């Protein structure tokens, strides 16, 4: 009986942490796109220069688990633990065309994808609070119902 309740609580904690990781990951990638835009706009840096100038903490917040910096941004996205597939699709689309056009066009593309990802971030964050409450309540309630039915 106690094991069922502990299992429900553990699953509840795991589900809530997953929702939090998803929201934090999307926020970190928004910050990454802001930095990319800033470095292209202000300093005219290439994608390789931008990648090597990124803060390790930002990469960890994005879910990067590698020891060495990847060679390009697509490799970075491939090695990150991204919990939100819509955000991953936006990022893959952006980085697949990044660095293949003139500076002015790159800035426009950065703004476009940053706007898309920011809208998605607001959606994910607004849903996160409700999902955390739902998962915390539902998992514990189901384990309690199971205990009542079994005993």
Mark where each language-model region is.
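Short, non-transmembrane cytosolic segments of multipass membrane proteins
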Residues: 74-104
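Membrane-interface, cytosolic juxtamembrane amphipathic helix immediately N-terminal to a transmembrane helix
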Residues: 100-141
